[in-house]
Each structure stands twice: as C-alpha cells, then as structure tokens.
C-alpha cells in the first residue's frame, strides 16, 4: 500500500518539457495529486506511450503509482487549469479543473507537444465542494470512447492509462474509485478564454491567444491580423470536427463551451454515445432534458460556442469595437458554409461518390429520410451499402436494414444511376467506402456491458475485448460479428451520465 506522495523516483519515465506553467500564475493553481490507498493498473496504452517517447518499461513497473497520482514523476509540475464556460447556455464565470491535474507536457518524436493529465486525482481549488474523484465506470467509458475515436480517424484526446484506487467514491451509490490518464494536444478550451474575458483581463486573453498561436497555429504569427486568423482557424477545425462526428453517428452530449478545445480535438466523453437507429433528434445525455445537444443540433451549437470565443477576442482583433465585431461576424457567418462543405464531402464518400454533382445533396438527404422513416441502423446501413457497392448480391442484406425491405428500391435505382457517372470502378468504390463506413463503433450496450462486468465482478475481459475490436473499426473481423449488431430491445441504453 502506498500511503503518501513520493517524488522523483522514476527518473525519466516522462521527458517533461512544460510550457503552460510559464504563463501568468492566475492561469492555474499549483496542485499535487492526492494519494490513494491501493492503486492497481487496469490498462497501460503501451503503443501511445512509445509514440510519446515515454519509458514503457518504467511505466509497466511504476504505472500504478504514477497514474494514480501517488508517485509524481521527475519533471512534473502539477497544476489545475482555470477556465469558465457556458453550460447548457448559462454562463459560469469560474469552473476550472475540479478533478483533473495536469502533470506536465511531453514532446513526441515528431515534435508535437502533448499534455499528460490525471482525471480523478483528487480535489483542487476549483472542485466546488466536490471530492475530485472518479468512479471506475466513467473512467472505462472514457478510455473506450477516446481510443475508438482515434481508430475511427476523428481528432480526439487519447487514453494513456486507467487505474483503480482501492478506495470508494460516493455518488448515488458507493462505487470503486479510479483515475484516468488523458493525453491531449492541449486542454485549452473556449471556456479558458472566457475566464479571462469575463474578468476584463484583456492582457490575460492576449497572453493566452499568443500561447495558443505559438503552440497550435505557429504559421499564424506571420498573418496580417494573427488574432482574427486564430479565430478563423479554430472555426475551421471545429467545423471539420463536428462534421466527422455526424459521419459516424457520434453525439457528444455536453457541448458546453468548456468542453470545446481550441486545438480541434474532441474532449470530455462523459455522457457521449453513438446513435443506433438513425434519428436526428437523438439524445442520450441524462442532463440534456430539452435536447439542446441532440445529434442534429451539434453543428449549430458549435457555431454558438465559437461566437462566444469570438467575443473574447474582439479587443485583440481590432481596437475599434465596431470594426472588430464586423470582422469576427464575417468569420462566424462562414462557419455554416464550412461545416456544410465538410459534412457533404464526407457523406458523398459514405455513399461512394468521388466527386460532387448538382442533386447529390438530395440523394444523401433522401437516404437519411428513408433510414429515419424505416428505423434503419446508422452504422450498419452504410456498411452494408459499402458491401453492395462491390457486389450486387449484397442487396438483400442492405434491404434488410429497413423495416420494409422493399422501401429502399427507389433510392437504390437513383443511387445506381448516379454511380454510372462516377469515375471509380466498383472495386475501387467498395474499398473507399469501407474505409469511411465503419463496421464497428462503441455500441452503447457493449460499453455498458464491459463497465458492468468490471464494476460488479472485477472482470475486465469484456473491456479488453471491446478495445481490441474497436481498434480496427474498418475491418470486417468475422470472429467478432456480434459486435457489429445493434442492441436488442432489452439491451438498449436510453440514457448516459456524466462521470469523469
């Protein structure tokens, strides 16, 4: 049992090169993790550790202590970041890392800088009477979803490790405690900018913007108006990101401004879920009672959040307020067109088209309307269409996606007519479609089954199996065909919950 913090024992397990700690002291609060009773390493992402240039052998040896927060690695400068945020439309001027502690930063072999953060590592000055801890269920969920998003090719924070703490956490029930180690390009959020803007701290906004440009958008240093260019670049990355969410049926669930990164990575997977049957109004998050963050609302919420970012940057964009507003408005108004372009390009890939013609949007919308009316599973329908693109014999299986199999006949006729003008061969098309239409997603019921086995029985075999399947989402994996299937009525997950 490790009962107290130890420092500097593991040597160079983490080659830290910290920069955020060099910002003004009111950007964060120095905060060491709180030791736990009996940490046990559930999972170490050895491939990611190697990519980051970490000492994998040292992490195998000391990982339970390091990733629980009991053993602070040499070079770490642990801190909790300050930020604010709009939560379901209401502004909170002070949120901050209430259960997360940034150990420091590392630079990988390609020169990219990443944060190493512990979630559930104990209370911080931003905990707001919380215990700063996390339960094992949300930790496993975040591990599964973040690694699945990576495998799907969607920018997202990564999972480096998960540990149990040997201590209970007290929620609606008593649950086993755990700590999650997250890797991110950075943890700077729209809400980080809002924190300083809400205090009238223009110097703080400027220091943060300069840091973000230097870290994430260095080419913008040469722009005529670097701060306007920064706003434009963040809008572009978010438009592309949210389009990718929609392409795989992902519903974030809690798109508050403190959960939107300026790096363009998906972050915070608490109540997120993947859609089964296609319905644009789908909501899973238990706290989203009015559907603010429903599947189809996500692009508009993204624009709303980015407008809040633009507001914080106005004093930097132009000293003349009206001119600053006009310039920022021009950027935010372009978001809709950008999103639509990214979304349509991806949807055309999903139905096998290499180029765009007039009428293609109508073809996509017709399929989505048919899927909604017929209760078709989002992921399976597009995967089966990929199979049909390469083999007409797969038509009965595609038709079986719909409650009334004959209902898809008219759409298939239109689709095939359109394919006749597409330059790809059938084989090329099928290969391309299978590379964008996954066979496997983190089905909500599969995630819950893995969590329940771990929580109730200490059995992590389903967790490991699910991680393995989801690491190759675009491969058929015949031995795991059951993981492709949507839930039976008795298996449906109706609501997801915040946790980490």
Curated annotation (Swiss-Prot):
Coiled coil: none annotated. Its cofactor is Mg(2+); Mn(2+). GO terms for molecular function: AMPylase activity; ATP binding; magnesium ion binding. Its EC number is 2.7.7.-, 2.7.7.108. It comes from the Bacteria. The keyword Nucleotide-binding applies. It catalyses: L-seryl-[protein] + ATP = 3-O-(5'-adenylyl)-L-seryl-[protein] + diphosphate; L-threonyl-[protein] + ATP = 3-O-(5'-adenylyl)-L-threonyl-[protein] + diphosphate; L-tyrosyl-[protein] + ATP = O-(5'-adenylyl)-L-tyrosyl-[protein] + diphosphate; L-histidyl-[protein] + UTP = N(tele)-(5'-uridylyl)-L-histidyl-[protein] + diphosphate. ATP binds at residues 96, 98-99, 119, 131-132, 182, 189, 268. Mg(2+) binds at residues 259, 268. The active site is at residue 258. It is an enzyme of class 2 (transferase). Signal peptide: none annotated. Keywords: ATP-binding, Magnesium, Manganese, Metal-binding, Nucleotide-binding, Nucleotidyltransferase, Transferase. The keyword Signal does not apply. NCBIfam families: PRK00029.1 (NF000658). Nucleotidyltransferase involved in the post-translational modification of proteins. It can catalyze the addition of adenosine monophosphate (AMP) or uridine monophosphate (UMP) to a protein, resulting in modifications known as AMPylation and UMPylation. Belongs to the SELO family. This is Protein nucleotidyltransferase YdiU. It comes from Rhizobium johnstonii (strain DSM 114642 / LMG 32736 / 3841).
